[in-house]
Amino acid sequence: MSSQFEQLKLLSVLVCDTGDPELVKSSESQDATTNPSLILKVAQEPKYQELLTEAIAWGIRQNGDDVQTLTFVLDKIQVNFGLEILKHIPGRVSLEIDARLSFNTEAMVQRAIFLSELFAASGGDKKRLLVKIPGTWEGIQAVELLEKQGIACNVTLIFNLIQAIAAAKAKATLISPFVGRIYDWWIAAYGDDGYSIDADPGVASVSNIYTYYKKFDITTQIMAASFRSKEQVLALAGCDLLTVSPKLLDELKKDQSPVERKLDPAEAKKLDVQPVELTESIFRFLMNEDAMATEKLAEGIRIFSGDTQILEAAVTEFIKQIAAQDV
């Protein structure tokens, strides 16, 4: 019997969720995803100093003011790590724009275009880049504009169906619903009632989105994310893509138990699902009605924003050190 990893690869595209290029290399995955939190964990490791220092030097050479230089450096760090990651996989990498722009459509569009152009200018193939945009109303409007310009988007921080429907209407390439964070909210709110994996709220949320998409022939891909256990991953076998931490990927490689398809487009077609009307007011009302989605979206933006600021502080210190050496 082959490993669960190999069996799962026959049902879903497996994606490695990390900022560490070496872990991507050993993951044997098709694609990779990263974010400021993941890059922060590895950016200051000695083995990646060259990626960091090159980004800082490049940013300084752009001759912007202090704020512009910091923006240049942060995006170049992402690009450098993204390109390094792409050396080890055949598919795509997802890079994220600054979460502090989450409620400014125009700013997100401009930043995503800059990131995409910087990626290409640094030697990357735009076809292998997904730009991660948060699943706010403003973010999804940015996605619609970006997709029309040929910039493929990954709508992240998806916590309920109305976000997924809005992203599909915007013709997003891909969405990332967060299994584990949904599960975390339910446990924190109502306690651990020993959810069976079939009743896991995070798994159920992604399953519902999958059913809706396949029922109505929506081409936007679903990449389930933020897993807390191998069991959650296996419960979504058949989802278009699964982005999984290196730790859980290793667990899948060590287990040879049978893997069963859980999500099937043909089965989704048979279900009685009604289309949901979408307007901005409906989106905002249904988000407001969903305490979990509202709270986890806000929390996710705060976490990514906070980690970006920590990374900024570290980069600022590096810039000061370089400036002092040049004096």
Curated annotation (Swiss-Prot):
The active site is at residue 132. This is Transaldolase. NCBIfam families: talAB (TIGR00874). GO terms for molecular function: transaldolase activity. It catalyses: D-sedoheptulose 7-phosphate + D-glyceraldehyde 3-phosphate = D-erythrose 4-phosphate + beta-D-fructose 6-phosphate. Its EC number is 2.2.1.2. Transaldolase is important for the balance of metabolites in the pentose-phosphate pathway. Keywords: Cytoplasm, Pentose shunt, Schiff base, Transferase. Its main location: cytoplasm. Pfam families: TAL_FSA (PF00923). Belongs to the transaldolase family. Type 1 subfamily. Coiled coil: none annotated. One of its GO terms (cellular component) is cytoplasm. Signal peptide: none annotated. It comes from Chlamydia abortus (strain DSM 27085 / S26/3) (Chlamydophila abortus). PANTHER family: TRANSALDOLASE. Homodimer. It is found in: Cytoplasm. It comes from the Bacteria. Pathway: Carbohydrate degradation; pentose phosphate pathway; D-glyceraldehyde 3-phosphate and beta-D-fructose 6-phosphate from D-ribose 5-phosphate and D-xylulose 5-phosphate (non-oxidative stage): step 2/3. GO terms for biological process: carbohydrate metabolic process; pentose-phosphate shunt. The keyword NADP does not apply.
